[in-house]
């Protein structure tokens, strides 16, 4: 069903923090129209009911309520994304849909708690005018993007937050501000520092070796 795909594409566009311009904006506008006409898959309908968002859905509802709930399960659990997919492909005969949607909301509350604890553990100055690179081995891969986003919002500078993976590498997530294209910044960093990276102007994911952290920090600040 093309309408179902339009709705899912709209949610994915906002949840992945894609720039809302051109085709992306059209996708989101079409998705919002369909949702507000009630033309949504059963799983999303149950989720909206749980959230009491059945009246008029806005872009802010997508970005600050629906998107974080959908993302939370995959951030915190290795198989979390599959549980979200299970909800979105289910039909009306799945009597467990209300429970599954409630579970997603509970997981998002857990995600909020972990994020608060992580932010509270960071010792940073009141003001910061230069790009920021931070690292903590215990944060967990699922919340580094959220940490970067919070600090980017607080200091209004580009931020990369790193944590340690099971393999010993550092996995990072970045958020940027208008005027600084994060993908272009990482394109300009020496390739021997980066194991891999990908994203767009506002958000990036990347991996480096731990021994390259200090060097990355210097190159990142210089490139910004």
Residue spans for each PLM region:
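Hydrophobic helix-and-loop "lid/oligomerization" segment in the mid-to-C-terminal part
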Residues: 2-222
């Amino acid at each position: 069903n093309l309408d179902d795909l339009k709705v899912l594409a709209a949610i994915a566009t906002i949840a992945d923090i894609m720039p809302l311009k051109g085709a992306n904006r059209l996708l989101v506008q079409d998705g919002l129209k369909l949702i507000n006409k009630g033309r949504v898959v059963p799983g999303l309908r149950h989720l909206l009911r749980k959230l009491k968002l059945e009246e008029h859905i806005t872009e802010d509802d997508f970005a600050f309520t629906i998107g974080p709930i959908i993302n939370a399960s995959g951030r915190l659990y290795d198989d979390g994304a599959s549980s979200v997919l299970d909800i979105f492909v289910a039909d009306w005969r799945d009597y467990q849909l209300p429970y599954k949607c409630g579970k997603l909301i509970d997981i998002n509350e857990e995600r909020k708690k972990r994020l608060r604890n992580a932010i509270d553990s960071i010792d940073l100055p009141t003001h910061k005018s230069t790009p920021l690179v931070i690292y903590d081995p215990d944060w967990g891969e699922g919340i580094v993007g959220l940490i970067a986003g919070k600090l980017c919002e607080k200091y209004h500078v580009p931020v990369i937050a790193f944590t340690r993976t099971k393999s010993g590498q550092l996995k990072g997530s970045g958020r940027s501000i208008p005027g600084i294209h994060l993908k272009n910044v990482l394109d300009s960093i020496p390739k021997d520092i980066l194991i891999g990276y990908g994203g767009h102007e506002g958000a990036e994911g990347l991996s480096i070796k731990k021994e390259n952290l200090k060097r990355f920090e210097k190159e990142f600040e210089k490139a910004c």
